[in-house]
Every structure is written in C-alpha cells, then in structure tokens.
C-alpha cells in the first residue's frame, strides 16, 4: 500500500504525462478529482487480499467484503464521490465489481458486491513486480492462516454472504425427505 501511495504522489505531480490518466478526448483530468481517485484506490489496495485480488479481509468465518460505504468512511469522501471515482477506475479497467444475488421465497436480494482490483491497474501505475511479489507472500500467509485455524483455504476466501447462501441451500436440499 505504501508503494501505491508513493506512486500516486508521483502521478499527481504531472498527471498529463500519463496517458491512462487522460480523458478519452485526450485532455487532462482535474487534479482534485485525481487526488480523490488516488484516495479511493489507496483504500482499496490497503484492503486488498492479493491472492484473489478481492477487496476485503480474510477471517476464520470466511471473507469479509468491503462495501462502497466502507470505502467512503475509510477515505473521508462522500459516497457519491466514491462512486464517481470508482466509475473512473472501472472505465480504465482497474476495478471490477460483481453483485451476487440470492432468491429467498421468490424475492431477489443483492448481496455485498465482490470488488476486485485488476492486474491492469498495477501494470498501468508501474507496480507490477511489487504486486506479483505481494501475491506470492499472500499465498504463503494464507496457507499459514489455514493451517492455524483448521479452516480450508477455499472457505477462508469465500465471501461470508455466499457461505451463508450455500449453507442455506444445502440445508434446504437435505431437508427433502423421501417416502
């Protein structure tokens, strides 16, 4: 995260020098807007689980995803501004966000979205090698956590909301009785 922060400081010194920070028409983007994008990306990288590139925290009960409201609180920006910055990052292919849904009694409910930072982000800002090293270190740390907690790695990295959904589905399947 510190390398990411340092890189953004350099990028903000002269943003028009970097083509991936320019608007589609080739004009430079306002510095304050880029500073807000940098704050959002800094928060996301700080909360990044490097092995899967998901934004959140690994716990013994599963993966705890971060919401956009968490990002707003963590950056001190209003939620509408965070969403503007996220759109900017998505347009550049730096972030993906998928919204899993669950059907309960015929009604669909949205679960916490799974946010990922793409490899393209780290290539664009020039931190690809550091990212690959962090990814390898994260794999080793996750294996140690898995061994110490006795929880399979797959369950550590599955979002908690999806684990609940899968458990509910398994309970419903097992509840079916045959005459």
Located regions from the model:
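Short recognition helix of helix-turn-helix/winged-helix DNA-binding domains
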Residues: 1-66, 168-178
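Electrostatic interaction modules used in gene-expression and signaling proteins
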Residues: 27-28, 96-101, 105-179
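Generic alpha-helical secondary structure signal
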Residues: 35-38, 80, 120
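Winged helix-turn-helix DNA-binding recognition segment
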Residues: 50-108
């Amino acid at each position: 995260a510190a390398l990411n922060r340092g890189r953004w400081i350099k990028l903000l010194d002269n943003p028009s020098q970097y083509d991936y920070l320019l608007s589609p028409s080739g004009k430079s983007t306002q510095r304050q807007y880029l500073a807000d994008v940098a704050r959002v990306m800094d928060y996301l990288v700080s909360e990044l689980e490097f092995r899967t590139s998901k934004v959140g925290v690994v716990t013994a009960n599963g993966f705890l995803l971060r919401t956009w409201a968490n990002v707003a609180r963590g950056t001190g920006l209003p939620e509408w501004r965070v969403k503007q910055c996220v759109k900017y990052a998505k347009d550049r292919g730096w972030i993906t966000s998928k919204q899993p849904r669950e059907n309960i009694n015929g009604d669909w409910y949205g679960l916490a979205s799974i946010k990922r930072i793409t490899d393209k982000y780290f290539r664009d800002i020039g931190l690809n090698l550091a990212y690959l090293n962090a990814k390898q270190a994260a794999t080793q740390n996750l294996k140690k956590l898995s061994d110490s907690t006795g929880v399979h790695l797959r369950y550590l990295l599955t979002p908690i909301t999806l684990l609940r959904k899968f458990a509910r589905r398994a309970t419903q399947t097992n509840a079916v009785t045959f005459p």
